[in-house]
Amino acid sequence: MKVGITASKSDDFSEWYTQVVLKAELADYAPVKGLIVLRPDGYSIWESIRTSLDVKLAARGVRNGFLPVLIPESLLGKEKEHFAGFNPEVFWVTHSGENKVGDRLALRPTSETLAYSLYSKWIKSWRDLPLRINFWNTALRAEIKSTKPFLRTSEFLWQEGHTVHACSEEAESEVAAILELYRETVEGDLAIPVITGRKSEKEKFVGAVYTTTMESMMPDGRALQMGTSHFLGQNFSRPFEVKFADKDNVEHFAWQTSWGLSWRLIGAMIMVHGDDKGLVLPPKVAPLQVVIIPISYSGEEGAQVLAAAEGMEAELLKAGIRARTDKREELTPGFKFHDWEMRGVPVRIEIGPRDLKDGSAVLATRHDGKKSKVPLDGAAVNIEEELCRVQTEMLGAAKRALDGMIHDASSYGALTKAVEGGGFVRAAWCGGLECEEKVKEETGADIRVVPEGGAEGACIVCGGRAASIPLFARGY
């Protein structure tokens, strides 16, 4: 395998993506088809997402729990519509050693049925509400389509939150608040802009009253769902008997929400920000934010350069900046430059003998390739400012790219043509399933998101009165 990225992002997007994942050492393929192994840098990015989200969730009173991976078939079938939606994707455990299990066990595709069977035991009174629990775990869903690391795998890391409320209004407020919290995380940490709104009835989560979603557009013109938040109403509390007694001791079925996002965000980050050299990482989630490269290694001069590099590393680490000095003497500085560029490290510091004399170092930023001078003394303040600039500029560039991939269509012909070109297509829709399915069948585009707001004019499919102006797109 050649060291660098050999595929072009614009010419062979799929091969480029795979090379970046493998060569930047984010993940590797497992021996079982459809599964991947997460390597330390890939897991570090996931940990950053998790830490950021945990802080926000804790501020809302959400606590973390753990659920087992095995779910009895009898439990899955309690909410039949929900189960039917996942049945084709379920992995089943039928034996324990040589013995056949009585009730087949599903490897968790999602945890609603398991969690709510327990919630019905835990909740008795209005004093037990609201109940807000989040679970960081894996989900397993057999992928029958072609698989791709982080985007389509049969096992994936995610978080799923499940809350219970005394009234519909509080539950719906929770749904909206979680989606906003997701948006803040994705835009603020991953520098990926999203469009929020609702899913259509056809595309909503199975068993939900409605689903809210955040969607983004990838550079290849295909949409990616970044996270969802569902209002479940009483669709699960009734079959699972999640009930509470109010202050007058009158019993009611509870109102529920569920919500989740997965490591698919890492795939989106790779696609949105990466270039032909490899990864481009937003500083907030980069496992390594600054790499320091000494230019000289030999003699007293080399020792002085290395000492300066290590001194800067210590200063940056003390300031809370993730930094490392590349001390690999067998590799040339040029090779190191390319290697760290491929791995997406946001800032590179170069220190050579001449820099020591000047009392400065060369700072290069990965996202734009710009170089500048930074003083050796007190470098942490300057580098912190650069990291903030990088984070802001990456989000700005991604927003401009997203804006350029949203198109308007005022006729069905314009819609079909725009879908072929890739990106989101904004068009009036009557809200009818028949019109939605016609677009899907003839263009391959789904309704990805229905933003808030009314609509004027006529449905571009049937000519009926428009109910909304959704964004259509082909997706992952």
UniProtKB/Swiss-Prot annotation:
Membrane-crossing ranges are: none
Q: Where in the cell is it found?
A: Cytoplasm
What Gene Ontology cellular-component terms does the record carry?
aminoacyl-tRNA synthetase multienzyme complex; cytoplasm
GO annotations under biological process? prolyl-tRNA aminoacylation
Assigned EC number = 6.1.1.15
Disulphide bridges, residue numbers: none
Swiss-Prot/TrEMBL keywords: Aminoacyl-tRNA synthetase, ATP-binding, Cytoplasm, Ligase, Nucleotide-binding, Protein biosynthesis
- Top-tier EC class: ligase
Report the catalytic activity.
tRNA(Pro) + L-proline + ATP = L-prolyl-tRNA(Pro) + AMP + diphosphate
Q: Does the keyword Cytoplasm apply?
A: yes
Q: Which domain of life is it from?
A: Archaea
Q: Which SMART domains match?
A: ProRS-C_1 (SM00946)
Keyword check for Aminoacyl-tRNA synthetase: yes
One GO molecular-function entry: proline-tRNA ligase activity
Which family does the record claim for this protein?
Belongs to the class-II aminoacyl-tRNA synthetase family. ProS type 3 subfamily.
HAMAP family reported in the protein's UniProt record: Pro_tRNA_synth_type3
Q: What does this protein do?
A: Catalyzes the attachment of proline to tRNA(Pro) in a two-step reaction: proline is first activated by ATP to form Pro-AMP and then transferred to the acceptor end of tRNA(Pro).
Q: Which comment does the entry carry about domains?
A: Consists of three domains: the N-terminal catalytic domain, the anticodon-binding domain and the C-terminal extension.
Q: What PANTHER family does UniProt report for this protein, alphabetically?
A: BIFUNCTIONAL GLUTAMATE_PROLINE--TRNA LIGASE, PROLYL-TRNA SYNTHETASE
Report quaternary structure and partners. Homodimer.
Q: What name appears for this protein in its UniProt entry?
A: Proline--tRNA ligase
Organism, per UniProt?
Cenarchaeum symbiosum (strain A)
Top-down, what is the taxonomic lineage of the species of origin? Archaea, Nitrososphaerota, Candidatus Cenarchaeales, Candidatus Cenarchaeaceae, Candidatus Cenarchaeum
